Regions:
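P-loop/Walker-type NTP enzyme "switch/lid" segment
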Residues: 1, 51, 55, 101-104
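Single conserved hydrophobic/aromatic residue that forms the stacking wall/gate
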Residues: 1-9, 13
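Nucleotide phosphate-binding site architecture
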Residues: 93, 99, 109
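C-terminal boundary of histidine-terminating zinc-finger modules
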Residues: 102-119
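Short, solvent-exposed loop/helix junctions and linker helices
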Residues: 6, 34, 69, 114-118
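Conserved catalytic-core segment of NTP-binding enzymes
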Residues: 10-96
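Proline-centered helix-kink/hinge sites
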Residues: 5-7, 26-29, 102, 107
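C-terminal alpha-helix
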Residues: 123-132
């Protein structure tokens, strides 16, 4: 289930982590995303220590990547230095079709399967399956 920090890190979020085996942490390639990450990691450690000792970070996903921006590259390098092999190789690039899809009530693959954004998520799916299998 998608549980973004904007939805709160309260009791519901902690319960969801307690019932999970692994989490995937999406991080936007923006400066302030790194600040929110510390709060998420604190909650993760709290749940792992007291409620679900088997909880692991299944992967870290970089989103809204823009190869034209130095900031995107810097954020990826910062995250890579901390998470190392947990960082997915797949990057989710900033893509207009990904932004449009929710306003049409559709996931990216149903909205435009040929878009680069949809292809990024298909690549991520393959990478996740390789890690799990």
């Amino acid at each position: 289930r998608d549980c973004t920090p904007s939805r709160g890190l309260g009791d519901v979020y902690k319960r969801q982590l307690t019932c999970s085996h692994a989490i995937i942490i999406p991080i936007q390639c923006e400066y302030y995303a790194l600040e929110g990450l510390s709060q998420l990691l604190n909650t993760f450690r709290l749940v792992q220590r007291h409620l679900n000792k088997k909880l692991v970070i299944g992967g870290v996903l970089m989103t809204m990547y823009d190869s034209r921006l130095n900031l995107s590259k810097q954020v990826v390098e910062e995250v890579k230095s901390y998470f190392k092999d947990k960082l997915f190789k797949t990057l989710i690039y900033r893509n207009v079709k990904l932004s449009e899809a929710p306003s049409f009530g559709k996931p990216a693959l149903l909205y435009d399967a040929s878009s680069n954004g949809a292809k990024n998520y298909l690549s991520l799916t393959e990478e996740i399956l390789q890690r799990v299998i």
